[in-house]
A protein has these predicted regions:
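Long, structured stretches of catalytic cores involved in phosphate-ester chemistry, encompassing
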Residues: 1-148
């Protein structure tokens, strides 16, 4: 996400990709050349699933952002506004397909020759030994193809 000021893009957060546009494009060239089209991320403490595109709008891969298990997430900071924030992220980011800033858990991958099954697995609470496993969100990523 970036803002426009006098025709120039300004970084919103220099601790994420919009703060490193040159490096992002170099990274995209590396993963395109290697045909390693799955990018795993996790520092945001929220669940993300995105198609990645370079500056020329060419597909370069899929980003899988893993949730936090105990670190603060969107819901911890914004509570009831989390759904609104998630929707605005999707509206403002062309490649972003899905985001969940509410649940704690982990992401698992089942890797096959031509595709990867991605499963975001969550629990009802991390504040008690008594918890429920929630229904996972799942995606199938085909090799070198954007998710549709």
């Amino acid at each position: 996400t970036s803002q426009q000021l006098a025709g120039e893009k300004l970084a919103i957060n220099t601790d994420q990709w919009d703060g490193y546009p040159v490096e992002r494009q170099k990274f995209y060239k590396i993963i395109t050349k290697s045909q390693a089209n799955i990018v795993l991320a996790g520092d945001s403490h929220n669940s993300w699933f995105s198609n990645l595109y370079d500056d020329d709008k060419n597909f370069v891969g899929v980003e899988i952002g893993a949730p936090a298990i105990s670190s603060p997430s969107l819901a911890d900071s914004y509570g009831d506004f989390t759904d609104i924030i998630e929707k605005s992220f999707i509206e403002e980011n062309d490649g972003l397909i899905w985001v969940n800033g509410s649940y704690k858990g982990y992401t698992s991958l089942a890797i096959h020759k031509d595709y990867i099954d991605v499963s975001y697995k969550y629990v009802s609470t991390v504040k008690s030994k008594d918890y429920l496993s929630l229904k996972p969100y799942t995606f199938r990523v085909e090799h070198n193809k954007p998710y549709t």
